[in-house]
Amino acid sequence: MKSERMRIKPMKQRLMIIIGFVLLCLQILKAQEKVNIWQGTACRKNVEMTAYLAKGGSKMAVIVCPGGSYLWHDMNGEGHEVGKWLQNNGISAFVLHYRTAGFMAFFLHYRLLFRGVRYPDALDDLTQATLYIKEHAREYGVCSDSIGAMGFSAGGHLVLSGVTLRQLPLTFVAPIYPVVTMNGKYVHKRSRRALLGDNRKNSRLLRDSLSIEHHISASCPPVFLVNCKDDPIVKYQNSELLDSALTVHNIPHQYIQYKTGGHGFGASDTKGSPECRQWKKEFLVWIRKLQTQ
């Protein structure tokens, strides 16, 4: 009888360990769940957003838009790594896999014949993502009035478009080494072609309408802006154009231009330079100050 009780006790312990492990896995899955932001709407697109929900901390939410010239996404370095970093610092993040033109559009130029993915598709996705988070704020444990957006490279252009062209109700935007202008000698041509489409890339009117530096207004929320002087992909003057426009319109913002770091370092602890990797610490200081204002 005694030996049977001794056998039962370890079995119960193992069962409790298994149950605990299953519950932990469910929590992890919940904290990193994927949703189709267009599900249940008239739009039949499948655009995924991955939630990285913070435990405790602030009730702020940040939509993360990876870069990739509006052709593809750096979903790891500028998406999921960023989401995990924000989550680990008490900020819930939502990594958006917004629509892009794709590799085939880049190589085959098929959009000369077919529409394909182009403006305003990605902006529509960001708009819907913002509305989706607002509608599900209680479920996610975030504040519906405390949603910001962070974008890298072309994703930086996207989040800036959200607050300038759509006046999305975002509390801040953080463009990191962003594409800003669609005109002139500082334009990132690959992003422009991907965004506008092969048939419309030469439209002066459309280029002007999507050049962010021309559309900053008093309704723009606070901005955290970072770039590097040695950026070999997106000319550093893009960020300087944005900084000038924000200054002219008295928009609260912090602009940090590092001498070294290049482009595409995201939230990495190894890419870029030791100097530019300080942007993450600077952002956390900035966002915490913003929350107290």
Indicate where each model-derived feature is located.
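Primarily recognizes the serine-hydrolase "nucleophile elbow" in alpha/beta-hydrolase
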Residues: 128-189, 207
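Mobile cap/lid helix-loop segments that gate and shape the active-site cleft of serine hydrolases
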Residues: 40, 178-215
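Short beta-strand element of the alpha/beta-hydrolase
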Residues: 59-67
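Catalytic nucleophile-loop/oxyanion-hole region of alpha/beta-hydrolase
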Residues: 74-75, 81, 94-144, 271-276
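N-terminal cap/lid segment of alpha/beta-hydrolase-fold proteins
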Residues: 32-56
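Short beta-strand/loop motif that positions the catalytic acidic residue
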Residues: 225-227, 231
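C-terminal catalytic histidine-bearing segment of alpha/beta-hydrolase fold enzymes
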Residues: 106-111, 240-293
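Conserved alpha/beta-hydrolase "acid-adjacent" motif
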Residues: 233-238
